[in-house]
Each structure stands twice: as C-alpha cells, then as structure tokens.
C-alpha cells in the first residue's frame, strides 16, 4: 500500500488524494478512520515478510505516525486512540529490534536514564494515563536510537521518508483550510486562533504546518519536484505559510524558518565530501532561497493586512494588556508565559537535582502564578524537573550523539 504512494508516475495524484483525504475528513471522520486501518491491513503482511524489512518498517513508521494529527483534528477517538503514534512507534521499533538483533548501546543507556522516573511521584497526583503520556515519548526516542543503529539510508530512501511525512501534513493543511470560515467572520486578536485550525489545538496544527513548510522546501531545494509540477509545489509551500501564519501560533512558523536556515547553513558550510551517487546540488541554495524569501515576505504582508496588522503585533509579542499599558512587554509575555514555566521547572530541579520529581509530576508541583497548573512547553526544562540529572544527561546525549555519529560518515 505505502509503496504505491511513492510511485513517481502518480505523484500528482497522490497529493490530490491527500488533499481530498483532509477535505473529506473535515466533514466526516469515517474517511480518515477507514484509511488508517486500510493502511494497517495492507502493511501488516508486508512487514511480516522480512525481505527489505528496515525499508518497509521505516516507511510504515513515518507514514502512520504522521497521520495522527489529522486523526485528532477529525476527532476519531476511540477508533484511532489518542497518542496512537507513540504506541505504533514503540511496537514497530521493538519488532524491528527483535528481528534485526539490534544492540544500540547508546539507546539502552537512554532507556536506563529515563525509566527510573516512572517509579516515583512526589506530587502523588500522577495517574497511569498521565504517566504513560509523559514517559512514552522519551522511551520511543531511546528505542529509535537502538532500532536505527547501523542502518544505512541512502538519498532515495531519505527522500521517500520525507514524502511520507509530508503527505499527511498536506491533508492537515486541506482540513484546516476547509474548516476556516470567511476571513471577515474571524476575530483576529493577539492570541492563537482556533478558527483557522479547524477547531483543534493551534500549537499542534501550527507545528505540522511548519514541518510541512520545511519538508517541502527541503525537497524543493534538492531538486525533487513533489508533484511533477513546480508551480503546484510552490502553491503547496505558500499554502503552508499562509495557513500557518493565520493560526497566530508562532512556534510552528518560527520553527520551520529556523529549520530552513539551519539546513542552508549546513549545506553551505558542511565539510562533508559529496559522493557522485548521493550528491545534493549546492549551487541551487541561493537560486531557491531568494524567491522563497520574497514569496514568504509577500505572504506575511498579505496576512498582516488581512488581520488588521495584528499578525505583526503578535510576532512582536504584543498582547491586549501590553497595548493598553497595563502589562509590560517582557520575555515572559513574549513567550506567552513559557519563560515562567521554564523557571518553575528549574526551581523544581534545584530542589530535586539527582532524580527529579517523577514523570508527569512537574505540572502539579511547579511554582507559577497561574491558578490552573500548566504542562511544560519546553522539553529540556521538563526533563530537568521530572528526571533530574539523568534527564540532563538524556538531553545531552541526544544533542551530541548525532554529531559524533556524523563524523564517521564520509559521504552524503
């Protein structure tokens, strides 16, 4: 099933299919539920066959996990359970590890660092559901390090994985676009906008749209035309920018922009030698960057005008309070109280340096000025507060390990 989505001869129609998938899911969740289980039904015997197992597993993991946000937007629970992607990843990683006899010692170390926090809770308020919600993500990361240990992914396989992550993002874009009312009916204030996200969480939708922007740009700059039509690819890319800006959730668009700039920096200044078989054409960097920046700025200006200049105020960190003079524009205001949450996590870590307060416990224990406890929005501070020194080591290993591994690779 998934291999047909990677057939370049029908690439345009694969994108049209995913646009229709998002459009129809906006009216009935039966569509995405049916598609999700059709993919599982056809892929299960495919991955049981061990021929080219890693390639098939990688494709299944990326595509099924990428469908989750669309499923959440369409409110498919309990048919497609909440957080299903974490369980799918865990199951498929374990399947691949067992069949391949992987021994990723770095991943085992990560597991050893993250698991202890599951066995204590200083808040005495962490339910089993909350515990699993908080611990499964880091566990999947550790299992992923073990699973991918020793795998060689060539350029073609990498681009296929990028496409499989991009297709569901296009569906999310279509869903949000269809559910967005007429712009004249939307009250654009200086906070995240749920009208332009299909009524779903603006942070999650904005993140997917920012990821879609980055992946589209990555394929574009590497000379890979997604739909076999350059103009259509450009429309998709600008669609991600337009809808992402309209969410008024800054993280997704800023994250996408930072990812693009980081990519260009690495492509320009990397000292890695390029092989003839997997060469990425570096001279195209400037050729693609300049028109992309111009179009991006034009879209930003259009959306800013559409929202009565509220978009530019939002990205400056202004709120109704700061404009009225009743609130000071500082780092905490600019980050929508995330800085205060970060400091609260650091305070918890100071009091529990070695082990932290336990997985999921920081929400109830964090000292903030908010009446309702808020979940952490910065993964580093959550790791420090809940896992202590072991959380810090977990983060540092994840940060350093890819670069140390990359030094051993002589070609791209």
Locate each region found by the language model.
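N-terminal signal-anchor transmembrane segment
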Residues: 2-98, 116-124
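Helix-loop-helix junctions and helix-breaking kinks within/between transmembrane helices
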Residues: 22-34, 73-82, 128-133, 200-206, ...
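Membrane-interface helix-loop-helix junctions at transmembrane boundaries of multi-pass membrane enzymes
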Residues: 47-55, 98-107, 219-234, 274-281, ...
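Loop-to-helix entry and N-terminal half of a specific, functionally important transmembrane alpha helix
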Residues: 58-66, 232-238, 378, 398, ...
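Aromatic-anchored transmembrane helix interface
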Residues: 79-93, 106-150, 163-173, 208
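Alpha-helical transmembrane segments of multi-pass inner-membrane proteins
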Residues: 118, 143-144, 159-187, 200-270, ...
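A membrane-periplasm/extracellular boundary helix in multi-pass inner-membrane enzymes
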Residues: 180, 246, 264-327, 347-351
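Long extracytoplasmic/lumenal interhelical loops at the membrane interface
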Residues: 186-188, 196-198, 322-387
């Amino acid at each position: 099933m998934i291999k047909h989505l990677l057939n370049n001869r029908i690439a345009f129609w694969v994108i049209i299919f995913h646009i229709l998938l998002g459009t129809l899911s906006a009216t009935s969740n039966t569509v995405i539920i049916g598609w999700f289980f059709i993919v599982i039904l056809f892929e299960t015997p495919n991955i049981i066959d061990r021929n080219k197992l890693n390639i098939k597993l990688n494709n299944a993991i990326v595509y099924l996990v990428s469908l989750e946000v669309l499923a959440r937007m369409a409110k498919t629970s309990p048919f497609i359970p909440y957080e299903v992607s974490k369980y799918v990843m865990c199951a498929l990683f374990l399947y691949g590890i067992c069949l391949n006899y992987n021994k990723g010692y770095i991943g085992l170390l990560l597991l050893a660092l993250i698991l202890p926090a599951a066995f204590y809770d200083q808040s005495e308020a962490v339910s089993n559901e909350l515990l699993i919600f908080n611990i499964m993500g880091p566990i999947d990361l550790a299992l992923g390090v073990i699973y991918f240990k020793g795998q060689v992914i060539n350029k073609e396989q990498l681009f296929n994985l990028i496409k499989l992550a991009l297709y569901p993002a296009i569906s999310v874009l279509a869903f949000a676009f269809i559910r967005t009312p007429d712009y004249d009916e939307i009250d654009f204030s200086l906070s995240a906008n749920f009208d332009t996200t299909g009524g779903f969480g603006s942070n999650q939708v904005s993140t997917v749209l920012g990821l879609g922007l980055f992946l589209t740009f990555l394929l574009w700059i590497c000379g890979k035309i997604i739909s076999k039509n350059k103009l259509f690819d450009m429309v998709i890319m600008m669609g991600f920018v337009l809808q992402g800006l309209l969410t008024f959730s800054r993280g997704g668009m800023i994250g996408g922009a930072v990812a693009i700039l980081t990519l260009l920096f690495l492509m320009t200044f990397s000292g890695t030698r390029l092989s003839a078989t997997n060469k990425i054409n570096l001279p195209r960097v400037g050729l693609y960057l300049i028109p992309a920046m111009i179009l991006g700025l034009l879209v930003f200006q259009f959306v800013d005008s559409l929202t009565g200049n509220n978009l530019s105020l939002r990205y400056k960190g202004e709120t109704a309070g700061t404009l009225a003079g009743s609130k000071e524009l500082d780092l905490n205001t600019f980050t929508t109280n995330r800085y205060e949450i970060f400091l609260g996590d650091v305070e918890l870590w100071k009091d529990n340096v070695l082990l932290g307060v336990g997985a999921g416990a920081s929400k109830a224990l964090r000292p903030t000025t908010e009446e309702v406890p808020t979940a952490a929005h910065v993964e580093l501070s959550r790791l420090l507060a809940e896992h202590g020194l072991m959380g810090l080591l977990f983060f540092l290993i994840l940060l350093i390990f890819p670069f140390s591994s990359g030094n051993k690779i002589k070609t791209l």
